């Protein structure tokens, strides 16, 4: 029997899946990179089956090692497929060694229940010691911090009170200054109103004086104009008289020359 047929029989015996890929020796798996050597898909199936059986039955313990398949049945299967008894025992011993190595690798990262309980007790003791340390710190340092915080709170309250007092004083002084400025502004406004009233009265008096002066000036002008007009009329009459006398005189002289001439 060839090595390929031997590998096929081993894979078929260990898987027990009845996959059609194992129906013929050398058929291989079409999803593998090495179709005639190893099927990684079926290897993963075998590994998951091994892990499941290991977790379910708790095979690997501190008492002893147990295997999840019957070595005698595998030997009989190999002998039924043409292997000799010596070859079958060698193959089964190789499988046992491989399983032991795999189990050791798997159980390196695992712990027993007793170890888990010991670790839990250690963790609980550490937690208890931490609690004790926290209680000690709370009694010593935390009390000091609490007293310091109380002092700071008292100082802050005093500062707050001083600040409120200063704010009240500033508000009172500002209010007093505001009232003084308000009264001063009112007085200034009253003074300005009084001055404005006096100015208005003086302006009214000036206007009245100007009106009186204008009326008097108009009257004087009217009297002067009437006097000038009367003088002009009198001068007119005098001029007319002089002209009439001079005209009559000239006529008289002219008549006298005319008579003398004739």
UniProtKB/Swiss-Prot annotation:
Residue stretches in coiled coil: 138-175
InterPro entries found in the cross-reference section: CCDC90-like (IPR024461)
Pfam family, one: CCDC90-like
Keyword Glycoprotein: no
Subcellular location: Mitochondrion inner membrane
A Gene Ontology term for the protein's cellular component: mitochondrial inner membrane
Residue ranges of the TM segments: 239-261
Gene3D superfamilies: 1.20.5.340
Keyword set, alphabetical order: Calcium, Calcium transport, Coiled coil, Ion transport, Membrane, Mitochondrion, Mitochondrion inner membrane, Transmembrane, Transmembrane helix, Transport
GO biological process, one term: positive regulation of mitochondrial calcium ion concentration
Topology versus the membrane: Single-pass membrane protein
PANTHER family: MITOCHONDRIAL CALCIUM UNIPORTER REGULATOR 1, PROTEIN FMP32, MITOCHONDRIAL
Described purpose of this protein according to its UniProt entry: Key regulator of mitochondrial calcium uniporter (mcu) required for calcium entry into mitochondrion.
Stated family: Belongs to the CCDC90 family.
Name listed for the protein in its UniProt record: Mitochondrial calcium uniporter regulator 1
Gene name, Swiss-Prot/TrEMBL: mcur1
């Amino acid at each position: 029997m060839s090595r390929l047929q031997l590998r096929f029989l081993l894979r078929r015996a260990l898987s027990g899946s009845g996959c059609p890929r194992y129906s013929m020796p050398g058929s291989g798996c079409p999803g593998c990179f090495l179709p005639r050597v190893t099927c990684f898909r079926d290897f993963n199936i075998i590994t998951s089956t091994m892990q499941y059986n290991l977790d379910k039955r708790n095979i690997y313990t501190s008492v002893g090692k147990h295997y999840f398949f019957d070595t005698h049945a595998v030997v009989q299967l190999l002998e039924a497929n043409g292997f000799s008894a010596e070859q079958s025992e060698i193959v089964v011993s190789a499988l046992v060694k491989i399983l032991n190595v795999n189990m050791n690798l798997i159980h390196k990262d695992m712990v027993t229940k007793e170890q888990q309980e010991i670790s839990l007790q250690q963790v609980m003791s550490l937690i208890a010691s931490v609690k004790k340390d926290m209680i000690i710190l709370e009694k010593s340092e935390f009390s000091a911090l609490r007293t310091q915080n109380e002092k700071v709170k008292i100082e802050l309250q005093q500062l707050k009170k001083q600040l409120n007092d200063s704010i009240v004083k500033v508000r009172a002084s500002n209010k007093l200054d505001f009232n003084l400025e308000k009264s001063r502004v009112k007085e200034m406004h009253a003074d300005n109103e009084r001055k404005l009233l006096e100015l208005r009265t003086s302006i009214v008096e000036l206007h009245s004086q100007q009106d009186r002066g204008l009326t008097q000036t108009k009257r004087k002008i009217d009297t002067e104009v009437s006097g000038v007009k009367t003088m002009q009329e009198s001068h007119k009459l005098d001029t007319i008289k002089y002209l009439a006398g001079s005209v009559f005189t000239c006529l008289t002289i002219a008549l006298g020359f005319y008579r003398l001439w004739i």
